[in-house]
């Protein structure tokens, strides 16, 4: 996976004022130029990212200029025991996507995918 663009820990901040021309409504195009937010959701373009994240309880930044490697649509109370390990940016191994996504959501976007598979052991 390509490294995230911008500050490793927090992603890239976007100046959303350039898309919010009227003060209350965004004028977004349908152009497909995907970006991945620190909430691990893919947005169709930077303008849509701004429109859909403006009212989040915590600030969302752009993790990378492309689709997300792992999509984390929502928190899950129950995770399966499937073993498909993912290595988090915190150096911890997560047994599967569900456990990784729950950690991402708890971290409020601070955690991102370092790589598929286990982290290197010391």
From Swiss-Prot:
The record marks 81-82 as: Reactive bond 2 for elastase. Disulfide bonds join 16-50, 28-47, 36-68, 72-101, 79-98, 87-119. It is found in: Secreted. The keyword Ribosomal protein does not apply. One of its GO terms (molecular function) is serine-type endopeptidase inhibitor activity. One of its GO terms (cellular component) is extracellular region. Its main location: secreted. InterPro entries: Bifunctional_prot_inhibitor, Kazal_dom, Kazal_dom_sf, Prot_inh_Kazal-m. The keyword Hydrolase does not apply. The record marks 30-31 as: Reactive bond 1 for trypsin. Keywords: Disulfide bond, Protease inhibitor, Repeat, Secreted, Serine protease inhibitor. Residues 10-70, 71-121 form the Kazal-like domain. Pfam families: Kazal_1. It comes from the Eukaryota. This inhibitor is composed of two homologous actively inhibiting halves: one which inhibits trypsin, the other which inhibits elastase. This is Double-headed protease inhibitor, submandibular gland. It comes from Mustela lutreola.
